[in-house]
Amino acid sequence: MSGKDRIEIFPSRMAQTIMKARLKGAQTGRNLLKKKSDALTLRFRQILKKIIETKMLMGEVMREAAFSLAEAKFTAGDFSTTVIQNVNKAQVKIRAKKDNVAGVTLPVFEHYHEGTDSYELTGLARGGEQLAKLKRNYAKAVELLVELASLQTSFVTLDEAIKITNRRVNRIEHVIIPRIERTLAYIITELDEREREEFYRLKKIQEKKKILKEKSDKDLEQRRAAGEVIEPANLLAEEKDEDLLFE
């Protein structure tokens, strides 16, 4: 096993404990990232469905708005000059908010009206009904355009976030966790080998001690047989003392 396949670490009980903790942490991180990816994917699909529905509705609204414009011009004449002269500042404005989905910040756009309607009196002479319908249709078109822009921005943001999250999951699952597992297996193998070597060494020591003891006992027996060894007195043995007579 090469050094690239595992983490360089000295095999010990402490290293084994550390690797087990790292493995558990990596597995927990992978599971959390998978849950995050699932949550992002769910929201991604919801937004995709909403984009399709909004685009279909957008086509209908824009067709209706274009038809209303033609109808208003036919009824009220060319009112573009009047509109341009009355423009001071934008009445419809956009503001951005933030939405959070599993730690990913999504921009949310919404439109609002500021000030009074500068074209409220436009069309009093003729074509008032057609102009009011025209304003409603284009207001609806602006609302849908803002919603569509918000959805598409969130769509792109979520798509990138899902790709990054899935890459992290794959790296943890296919690179980090296997590397830790190989390191842990290496540590366990080395520790088992050390235990076997220690057991063999202790067994050899015991065998050597046994041989030395047997040899020592044999030499002692031979010396006893030759009378070279005097048995030491047993102080604990019971001996009868002679009576002492006192005159």
Curated annotation (Swiss-Prot):
V-ATPase is a heteromultimeric enzyme made up of two complexes: the ATP-hydrolytic V1 complex and the proton translocation V0 complex. The V1 complex consists of three catalytic AB heterodimers that form a heterohexamer, three peripheral stalks each consisting of EG heterodimers, one central rotor including subunits D and F, and the regulatory subunits C and H. The proton translocation complex V0 consists of the proton transport subunit a, a ring of proteolipid subunits c9c'', rotary subunit d, subunits e and f, and the accessory subunits ATP6AP1/Ac45 and ATP6AP2/PRR. Interacts with SNX10. GO terms for cellular component: centrosome; cilium; clathrin-coated vesicle membrane; proton-transporting V-type ATPase complex; vacuolar proton-transporting V-type ATPase, V1 domain. Its main location: membrane. Signal peptide: none annotated. It is a peripheral membrane protein. It comes from the Eukaryota. Subunit of the V1 complex of vacuolar(H+)-ATPase (V-ATPase), a multisubunit enzyme composed of a peripheral complex (V1) that hydrolyzes ATP and a membrane integral complex (V0) that translocates protons. V-ATPase is responsible for acidifying and maintaining the pH of intracellular compartments and in some cell types, is targeted to the plasma membrane, where it is responsible for acidifying the extracellular environment. May play a role in cilium biogenesis through regulation of the transport and the localization of proteins to the cilium. Keywords: Cell projection, Cilium biogenesis/degradation, Cytoplasm, Cytoplasmic vesicle, Cytoskeleton, Hydrogen ion transport, Ion transport, Membrane, Transport. It is found in: Membrane; Cytoplasmic vesicle, Clathrin-coated vesicle membrane; Cytoplasm, Cytoskeleton, Microtubule organizing center, Centrosome; Cell projection, Cilium. It comes from Bos taurus. InterPro entries: V_ATPase_D. One of its GO terms (molecular function) is proton-transporting ATPase activity, rotational mechanism. GO terms for biological process: cilium assembly; pH reduction; protein localization to cilium; proton transmembrane transport. Expressed in brain (at protein level). Present in tissues active in secretion. Amounts elevated in brain, kidney and testis. This is V-type proton ATPase subunit D. Belongs to the V-ATPase D subunit family.
